A protein has these predicted regions:
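A contiguous loop/helix-start segment that scaffolds small-molecule binding in enzyme catalytic cores
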Residues: 59-126
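Class I SAM-dependent methyltransferase SAM-binding "motif I" and its flanking Rossmann-like core
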Residues: 1-61, 109
Length: 126
């Protein structure tokens, strides 16, 4: 979960400095809280997926999918979400003054920041 930070962490250690990893609130948990939503319920599964790679197969997984760092490939990601008729919400810059929330694939802009994540939930049966 500390993927990007670990690159910096290793370099700091290699340069002879002391560094520690301190636990905190993950961005996808903060985004769900900002949306006043849980990520999963009961026996649902949670999948955290880097959106900068192929997501097509991953969106077939059952449960909730979190697409991390979705900004780079946003037009392709949006198109795929629309084609699959996914229930998707996006939080951009979670916890920052510039935080934005989008509540459907149609609302999500084609250009988004590095700090954009999309939560894809299965549609509930009525």
């Amino acid at each position: 979960v500390y993927s990007t930070y670990l690159y910096v962490h290793r370099r700091v250690l290699e340069d002879g400095y002391d560094a520690r990893i301190v636990s905190g609130v993950t961005s996808f948990c903060a985004a769900a809280a900002s949306l006043s939503e849980g990520l999963v319920e009961n026996s649902e599964e949670l999948h955290v997926i880097p959106a900068s790679y192929q997501i097509e197969d991953a969106l077939e997984f059952s449960g909730t999918k979190v697409l991390m760092k979705a900004g780079k490939k946003m037009p392709a990601v949006k198109q795929f979400l629309k084609e699959k008729n996914c229930r998707a919400v996006m939080v951009e810059n979670c916890g920052m003054d510039t935080e934005q929330k989008y509540f459907s694939a149609e609302e999500i802009p084609d250009q988004a920041s590095y700090y954009s994540l999309i939560i894809v939930k299965e549609k509930r049966k009525k």
